[in-house]
Design a protein with these regions (language model features):
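Short alpha-helical segments that sit at the start of domains
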Residues: 1-13
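Short amphipathic alpha-helical interaction segments
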Residues: 33-49, 53-55, 68
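Intrinsically disordered, low-complexity Ser/Thr- and acidic-rich flexible linkers and loops
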Residues: 59-65
Length: 88
């Protein structure tokens, strides 16, 4: 299995997502203190890779539509992502 490598900003966003219930874009932005447009860009990349999922489905995730969307960790990658976060 391939080892997941994440940037510091990707790690911050993934750590801000609640594993049990998910988090809205606004909650993620508040927890990370990253600019909204940058959070939207990071979330879009994580969704494209498959590490995160967005509800309701919007493609692409943009600064205009991320705030009210709910983001969850993809259960298929949950263990690998937790391991990647522990390494840093």
């Amino acid at each position: 299995m391939k080892q997941i490598k994440l940037s510091g900003r990707e790690l911050a966003v993934l750590r801000a997502i609640d594993y049990a219930t998910g988090s809205t874009g606004t909650e993620i932005q508040e927890k990370t203190s990253i600019d909204g447009a940058d959070v939207a860009e990071i979330l879009n990349a994580l969704c494209e890779i498959g590490y995160a999922e967005v509800y309701p489905l919007v493609d692409p995730v943009t600064a205009a539509n991320y705030a009210g969307s709910r983001f969850e960790i993809n259960p298929s990658y949950a263990l690998q992502l937790k391991e990647a976060m522990r390494r840093r």
